[in-house]
Amino acid sequence: MHSRLPTHAADLLQALSRLPRNAGRGLIWVYRHSFSALVGSNCRHLPTCSQYGDEAIGRFGLWAGGWMTLARLIRCNPYGTSGIDNVPETPPPGARWYLPWRYARWRGVNGPDCGCGHHDE
């Protein structure tokens, strides 16, 4: 019984630490199955902004993934970017929890480089 208590406490702490991440992903799920289902997909990127947000928050947590998603939403407009824009595999260099804007890519996309030089923004 005593060996079960530390494991249970660790499981509880792990579940509590995932709560913000799951709440953010839950909001995206609600958006996808309500408003987005009625209006349809109008995103200029692949993956869509809601898919990007779900993946970013799932991978990096609500704080960092939320900032990445905010920057993506700002870029997704008629005068913004378009094309392939995947969630980065690792946090960008210089990103710290107290400098949250550094998690986000505010310009450009990270699609495959075609060698033309315009992806170096």
Curated annotation (Swiss-Prot):
<comment type="function">
    <text>Could be involved in insertion of integral membrane proteins into the membrane.</text>
</comment>
<protein>
    <recommendedName>
        <fullName>Putative membrane protein insertion efficiency factor</fullName>
    </recommendedName>
</protein>
<keyword id="KW-1003">Cell membrane</keyword>
<comment type="similarity">
    <text>Belongs to the UPF0161 family.</text>
</comment>
<keyword id="KW-0997">Cell inner membrane</keyword>
<dbReference type="Pfam" id="PF01809">
    <property type="entry name" value="YidD"/>
</dbReference>
<dbReference type="InterPro" id="IPR002696">
    <property type="entry name" value="Membr_insert_effic_factor_YidD"/>
</dbReference>
<dbReference type="GO" id="GO:0005886">
    <property type="term" value="C:plasma membrane"/>
</dbReference>
<keyword id="KW-0472">Membrane</keyword>
